[in-house]
Amino acid sequence: MKFAQPHNPLLPSVPDIVFSAIVLAIVLPFFWWFVIPRISKLLSDRSSLIEGKISEAASAHARALETLELRKQQLDEAKSEASQIRQEARDDAQLILQQARETADETAERVMLHAREQIQAEKAAALLSLRSEIATLALAAAGKAVSEKLDDDKKSRELVSASIAKMAEDAG
């Protein structure tokens, strides 16, 4: 009789090992041809999808950066254009102000010239009137002197002086 060795509880029994090997031989090809390829395909598809999303995000990020740069450039151009427009407006305002001053100066000069001409005309008319008045008074004085038949030069001078004084009073 052989001594039976005691059974180790940690090791499976021989029938369990044989049954497990048969089940594994049946199930392993099924997993190898059907389940593993599907899982691999699913993981590959998921990986491709994630990589596609990452590349889309990268291209969207690149487009966003390009758009940002474009907007910055447009903003800089708009600022430059606005600055140029403001400068042109200042220049135009200075030109308009200068033209207005020149027009005002020309108008003032014309008014002054017209006033001088009017003063000269009135002065000439006053002188003409004064000469006419003096001539009339001189004739009147001469007529008076002749009518009184003055013999004396002294009296004649007094009469002329009185006539001139009267003329000065009438003129003033």
From Swiss-Prot:
Compartments reported by the entry: Cell membrane
Family annotation (InterPro entries): ATP_synth_B-like_membr_sf, ATP_synth_b/b'su_bac/chlpt, ATP_synth_F0_bsu_bac, ATP_synthase_B_chain
Job of this protein: F(1)F(0) ATP synthase produces ATP from ADP in the presence of a proton or sodium gradient. F-type ATPases consist of two structural domains, F(1) containing the extramembraneous catalytic core and F(0) containing the membrane proton channel, linked together by a central stalk and a peripheral stalk. During catalysis, ATP synthesis in the catalytic domain of F(1) is coupled via a rotary mechanism of the central stalk subunits to proton translocation. Component of the F(0) channel, it forms part of the peripheral stalk, linking F(1) to F(0).
Upper taxonomic lineage: Bacteria, Bacillati, Actinomycetota, Actinomycetes, Micrococcales
Record's subunit section: F-type ATPases have 2 components, F(1) - the catalytic core - and F(0) - the membrane proton channel. F(1) has five subunits: alpha(3), beta(3), gamma(1), delta(1), epsilon(1). F(0) has three main subunits: a(1), b(2) and c(10-14). The alpha and beta chains form an alternating ring which encloses part of the gamma chain. F(1) is attached to F(0) by a central stalk formed by the gamma and epsilon chains, while a peripheral stalk is formed by the delta and b chains.
Sequence similarity: Belongs to the ATPase B chain family.
UniProtKB keywords: ATP synthesis, Cell membrane, CF(0), Hydrogen ion transport, Ion transport, Membrane, Transmembrane, Transmembrane helix, Transport
Gene that this polypeptide is encoded by: atpF
GO terms for cellular component: plasma membrane; proton-transporting ATP synthase complex
UniProt superkingdom: Bacteria
Ranges annotated as spanning the membrane: 17-37
Gene3D superfamilies: F1F0 ATP synthase subunit B, membrane domain
Membrane topology value: Single-pass membrane protein
Keyword field contains Ion transport: yes
Keyword Transport: yes
Protein name: ATP synthase subunit b
Molecular function GO labels: proton-transporting ATP synthase activity, rotational mechanism; proton-transporting ATPase activity, rotational mechanism
